[in-house]
């Protein structure tokens, strides 16, 4: 028989991260077709984000949110974006699991003549410097990575010292709105 899994110290969020809710403001002109371009489904954080995305869509009463699981590269982000934008009921908003895929998605939208944010809102996940260097600048979820690193270091020192390690929650990411997000166009106005 297998022994029960060992509990390891962890630093993490007490609740799943926001996703679709970050690009959907309540109201009559809210996004209803939201997609997510995520990392490999087998990775724990990708699975947590996918679950949070699905739960948020359900809470918002939205059907048909689409996931495209890819690697984290720009090439795969571009391929996923292109496949989403070629569908007849293309999304009005896409949430990306990292900034590189979001930058690639922005490039694909430009190549395809899809105006960001007039026709499509894009949201990046990491809020790296890349988000401020694009045109339009990318809205993103901001994380306090320095505080997260400090918490991880404190946990490591506690483990090394043989001290009891308590769970350490970290702050939920916050939305940094920039120029890549806007309410969707009214029905029938989209080209």
Language model segments and positions:
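Bacterial carbohydrate/catabolite-sensing allosteric modules
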Residues: 1-191
